[in-house]
């Protein structure tokens, strides 16, 4: 009966399937729109530059591609001769990869448009208010600060990957009725699997090392959406238990299930027994492939949810999810990494003196505070990968930037430093940011000295405060005016308050290394 109820729930939500406009792939303006829709020339300009042509020739390649797509047997030729790298009947390896990338990117853009229109139309019908401030990544941390201080347990979840490519097609099959589009998607995934082992270091095909990002990002988002879709259903089913009266719930579950073993239900244990069986309210936060599940329940309750998730991924997506990808810990003694921050709960014991008439009492209490700091080792590791410092944190020069002008070098280092300071403005300890600023500042000085074949001391004496101003963020300038005692150029004089900004829509590249 319960299985039937779950099936009806899934069919009810998925009943509104979206028709896919397959003929759009034969329209030239779709490829032009795909190029302007955020590709930044990744599939049109880079290949033509390698071929020695100008950028206008991309329209010629699009027309050539559409003509080949109209051929009756292009998919058959491509499938039967996949070992020869033939695509759309073309023997040239470069054009085969290039045409495939053009179609896959346009395919992804069309799906994005259709599902975006569907989302907008549904939100207009429901009159859902749009809160643009909540688009910021930093808006997650005030939510965690408000909720986690009252919770006990947390599950650190890594969403399983990779999954079988056919599962991605089946996920879209629930929402797309156009069969040719699904066959085309299967064809792309099959070709990508073959090409993935054929990429070499040749300059002519180097551009394909970052191909099809839009398509696979879209498929991954649909996969995550499917996971969260069923998770919300399980959450709704568990929340129903909270609406059940305590007495009825105890009678149905506890009394009849344990009547053979319990002779008397003690009144003192009544609340504890009810708390064990009721389903505490849970909080779920996710970014990219990492999610956090926090609850006020017991460790046994979190283990039940872990079992639910593992079985769900196993039976719903038909692949085994390693249980060790879900870590259950107590919030009181656990620190977790999320969105580049190291977060934890700080417990500060306090003694409060209470005076009542002639009697006084000392009350011991504990204040819980959600704390976020910028981790030192991951940031230095990211700077090391980007060739700004060594693994020990010693600044080094950036040889690839020595051909730039002095203004460009200083501007690049300054923008990186300001972006990191802006992103980690919510850190309660600024010492890590001071160290990162120090590394970037002296890496900039070493790069300038290397470009002019001089010493670092010479440039530091010549530029002085001018170089330091480039690493001085706007918020620090404003706060230096508000708090005059803070010296503008003192590394240890900056503010210690945490600030969350509402204009950060993506994680910093150095944070995401």
Swiss-Prot record:
The keyword Transport does not apply. Its main location: plastid. It is found in: Plastid, Chloroplast. GO terms for biological process: mRNA processing; RNA splicing; tRNA processing. InterPro entries: Domain_X, Maturase_MatK, Maturase_MatK_N. The keyword GTP-binding does not apply. GO terms for cellular component: chloroplast. One of its GO terms (molecular function) is RNA binding. Usually encoded in the trnK tRNA gene intron. Probably assists in splicing its own and other chloroplast group II introns. Belongs to the intron maturase 2 family. MatK subfamily. This is Maturase K. It comes from Typha latifolia (Bulrush).
């Amino acid at each position: 009966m319960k299985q039937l109820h779950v099936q009806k729930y899934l069919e009810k939500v998925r009943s509104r399937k979206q028709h896919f406009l397959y003929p759009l792939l034969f329209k030239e303006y779709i490829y032009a729109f795909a190029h302007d829709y955020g590709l930044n020339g990744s599939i049109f300009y880079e290949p033509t530059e390698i071929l020695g042509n100008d950028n206008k020739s991309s329209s010629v390649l699009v027309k050539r591609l559409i003509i080949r797509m109209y051929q009756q047997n292009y998919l058959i030729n491509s499938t039967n001769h996949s070992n020869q790298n033939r695509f759309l009947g073309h023997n040239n390896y470069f054009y085969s990869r290039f045409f495939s990338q053009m179609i896959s990117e346009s395919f992804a853009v069309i799906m994005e448009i259709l599902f975006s229109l569907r989302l907008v139309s549904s939100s207009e019908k429901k009159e859902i208010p749009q809160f643009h401030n909540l688009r910021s990544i930093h808006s997650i941390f005030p939510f965690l600060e408000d909720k986690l201080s009252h919770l006990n347990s947390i599950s650190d979840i890594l969403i399983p990957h990779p999954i079988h490519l056919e599962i991605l097609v089946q996920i879209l099959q629930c929402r797309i009725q156009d069969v040719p589009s699904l066959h085309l998607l299967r064809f792309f995934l099959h070709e990508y699997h073959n090409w993935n082992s054929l990429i070499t270091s040749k300059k002519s095909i180097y551009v394909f090392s970052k191909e099809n990002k839009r398509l696979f990002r879209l498929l991954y988002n649909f996969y995550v959406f499917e996971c969260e879709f069923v998770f919300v259903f399980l959450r709704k089913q568990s929340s129903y238990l909270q609406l059940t009266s305590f007495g009825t719930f105890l009678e149905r579950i506890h009394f009849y299930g344990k009547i053979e073993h319990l002779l008397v239900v003690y009144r003192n244990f009544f609340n504890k027994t009810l708390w064990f069986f009721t389903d505490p309210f849970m909080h779920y936060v996710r970014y990219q492939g990492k999610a956090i599940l926090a609850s006020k329940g017991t460790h046994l309750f979190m283990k039940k949810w872990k079992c639910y998730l593992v079985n769900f991924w196993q039976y719903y997506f038909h692949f085994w999810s390693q249980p060790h990808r879900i870590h259950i810990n107590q919030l009181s003694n656990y620190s977790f990494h999320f969105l580049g921050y190291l977060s934890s709960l700080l417990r500060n014991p306090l003694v409060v003196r209470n005076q009542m008439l002639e009697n006084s009492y000392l009350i011991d209490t504990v204040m819980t505070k959600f704390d976020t700091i910028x981790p030192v080792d991951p940031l230095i590791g990211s700077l090391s990968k980007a060739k700004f410092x060594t693994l020990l944190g010693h600044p080094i020069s950036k040889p690839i930037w020595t051909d730039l002008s002095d203004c460009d070098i200083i501007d690049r280092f300054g923008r990186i430093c300001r972006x990191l300071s802006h992103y980690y403005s919510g850190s309660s300890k600024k010492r890590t940011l001071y160290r990162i600023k120090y590394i970037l500042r002296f890496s900039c000085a070493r790069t300038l000295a290397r470009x002019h074949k001089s010493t670092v001391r010479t440039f530091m004496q010549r530029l002085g405060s001018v170089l330091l101003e480039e690493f001085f963020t706007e918020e620090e300038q404003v706060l230096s005016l508000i708090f005059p005692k803070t010296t503008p150029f003192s590394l240890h004089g900056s503010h210690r308050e945490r600030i969350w900004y509402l204009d950060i829509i993506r994680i910093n590249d150095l944070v995401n290394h």
